[in-house]
Curated annotation (Swiss-Prot):
One of its GO terms (molecular function) is RNA binding. This is Ribosomal RNA small subunit methyltransferase F. It comes from the Bacteria. Belongs to the class I-like SAM-binding methyltransferase superfamily. RsmB/NOP family. Specifically methylates the cytosine at position 1407 (m5C1407) of 16S rRNA. The lineage of its organism: Bacteria, Pseudomonadati, Pseudomonadota, Gammaproteobacteria, Alteromonadales. The gene is rsmF. It is an enzyme of class 2 (transferase). Pfam families: Methyltr_RsmB-F, Methyltr_RsmF_N, Methyltranf_PUA, YebU_pre-PUA_dom. One of its GO terms (biological process) is rRNA base methylation.
Length: 479
């Protein structure tokens, strides 16, 4: 049972549209959320995923605003986060409403979704990324093309963000760790698209946490609103002319939503154009405000409360701060031609993996990395925590592939494991082989034709090379 205080209910009653009722708001706020997931199309098609999981007792109800999103019913009480398919990165457990902002950001590309190269030169900024649901959704919509800068202010949450980015096989991402208010200064008019899923009071999340609003006080929100206004200004400054900014929160009040967008309009005048989201998906108009924003109340779609606004930058704005000095001592250098040839041959010969040609192979000490080409002009303008994916380490003789490279780069050559073998592998154990054959060296091990990681084939067993931090104590199997 959700715990409301009267101040919160009074605030909701002021902001709730006249065609919606407080009774429904309270009733839906007391209902548990429907379980929802998003298929990761960087690894598996939506159709193949449905076939795979339907055979394991799942049923699917499409989420109307995300082609890869579904409310799901499962026939067991398994912890989905401990299933093999989740650990492989085939899906993300994501609340349905939170799939709206990336959909709004990319809706103009929906008609060209089969053009897999349309984002090759695109730069996208996700200003507040952790834990990574929207970041990985954006990467999938971009088909790992172009550059996705994912920023997170909290140091501990950066680690979670990277873990999810790696699990989902994202390779076009650069991670940063800043107060996002710096982007307008450091990367002025750099990005084609910007997502600001702003820190907020979290009023829309009460269906996840009944105590979320127990001590709600509108006076506590002033500092949050000031931060939101500063962040949306920074986002707009970082946006190219002609680009789109999506501002979203899981708050319900006008103060944190419409008022913040109107603040931007006041600050930048005719350079700001509100883009209507009335036709983003069937029945979107049920949640639309007079400006064309989506103000999703829990009872409209039986989901979390959410707010989404899409804003176009239709003309240039003045840069008020000078361009910062270039940062020095970047620790990476471009790989030499011979190194690239050797590394390319290693991946092709060992794993039948062809390294992408639309990326840069970079070297730091004995490490080889794959950088998105679109990040190269930004080197020195901002400090990055991590760029692209780590491909391999150089040994005295040859190379040793990195786990994240196997998850991100597709290969037709795999050693397929059974349910029980996959469970053993993810628990860090070696896999005994019934038939002794000639040792094959490093091999990609897979489950349901999707990679799990790398093992060393010794003839009579597969020696587990799963990174220790990914070893699980418990794996959930379907009976």
């Amino acid at each position: 049972m959700a715990h409301f205080n009267q101040n919160f209910l009074d605030s909701i009653e002021r902001d709730l549209p006249s065609h919606l009722s407080m009774e429904d708001f309270i009733a839906y706020s007391n209902k548990p959320l429907r379980l929802s997931i998003r298929v990761n199309t960087l690894k598996i098609s939506t159709e193949n995923f449905i076939d795979l999981m339907s055979a394991k007792g799942w049923s699917f109800d499409p989420i109307p605003w995300c082609n890869q999103g579904f409310w799901v019913t499962i026939s067991s009480d398994l912890q989905l986060g401990n299933t093999i398919e989740h650990l492989q990165g085939l899906f993300y457990i994501q609340e349905a409403s939170s799939m709206l902002p990336p959909t709004a950001l990319f809706d103009s590309h929906a008609d060209n979704e089969n053009d897999l190269s349309q984002f090759a030169q695109t730069r996208v900024l996700d200003m507040a990324s952790a834990p990574g649901s929207k970041t990985t959704q954006i990467a999938a919509l971009m088909n790992n093309q172009g550059l996705l800068v994912a920023n997170e202010y909290s140091a501990s949450r950066v680690k979670v963000l990277h873990a999810n980015v790696a699990r989902m096989g994202v390779s076009n991402c650069a991670l940063t760790h800043f107060d996002a208010r710096v982007f307008g200064e450091y990367l002025f008019e750099t990005f084609d698209s910007v997502l600001l899923d702003a820190p907020c009071s979290g009023e829309g999340t009460i269906r996840k946490d009944p105590d979320a609003l127990k001590n709600w006080d509108n006076n506590d929100n002033k500092g949050i609103v000031d931060t939101q206004k500063a962040l949306i200004e920074s986002a707009f400054l970082a946006l190219k002319v002609g680009g789109c900014l999506v501002y979203s929160t899981c708050a319900l009040s006008r103060q944190e939503n419409q008022d913040v967008c109107h603040h931007l309009k006041t600050a930048f005048g005719e350079a700001v154009e509100f883009a209507a989201l009335t036709e983003l998906f069937p029945d979107a108009d049920k949640a639309c405000t007079e400006e064309g924003f989506l103000h999703v109340w829990p009872q409209i779609y039986d989901s979390e409360g959410f707010f989404v606004a899409k804003i176009r930058k239709v003309s240039a704005v003045e840069r008020t701060l000078p361009e910062p000095k270039m940062q020095k001592n970047f620790p990476f250098t471009a790989a030499k031609t011979k190194q690239i040839e050797e590394l390319t041959a290693y991946f092709e010969d060992s794993f039948a993996i062809t390294l992408p040609t639309d990326a840069e192979i970079m070297v730091r000490d004995l490490e080889f990395w794959l950088f998105p080409k679109a990040v190269m002009p930004l080197i020195g303008k901002m400090r990055f925590q991590r760029i692209g994916i780590k491909l391999a380490d150089a040994l005295k003789k040859g190379y040793k592939v990195r786990h994240e490279a196997i998850l991100a780069l597709s290969s037709p050559t795999r050693f397929e494991l059974s349910d029980e073998q996959a469970k053993e592998f993810l628990m860090g154990r070696d896999i005994s082989l019934v038939e002794k054959v000639k040792p094959q060296g490093e091999v990609i091990v897979s489950y349901a034709s999707n990679p799990l990681g790398v093992a060393k084939h010794l003839g009579n067993k597969l020696k587990n090379n799963l990174p220790r931090d990914l070893v699980k104590d418990k794996i959930a199997l379907y009976q």
